[in-house]
Amino acid sequence: MADGRFDVDLLDEQDPFEIDAQAAHLFKHPHLGIEDIDDVWSSDPLFYPAKPPAHWLMCAEVSGRVLVVPLAPSRSGDPRRCRPIGCYEAAPALAGQYRRDR
């Protein structure tokens, strides 16, 4: 843990997500869902520190849009997994930062 955040380098490459039963209500865009979280993960994402309850903002460009997935630690305590707590299009400032960092 760096700065109290979970270590993204320990996440399982194939199955890193612990999806809560009520995750659907966390999506701010009606056309984004769990499949998009998988797309962000498989698109060589960048990670930015987040405000609680998330530890990280996982960002990647998917189909021309920068998507952001806030990640919280696994409820089970498994360091190989984390909980995505949303999925939405990045705000212009974060999208710009992501594109500069790429």
Spell out what each predicted region is.
Residues 1-102:
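Ribonuclease/tRNase effector modules and their secretory precursors
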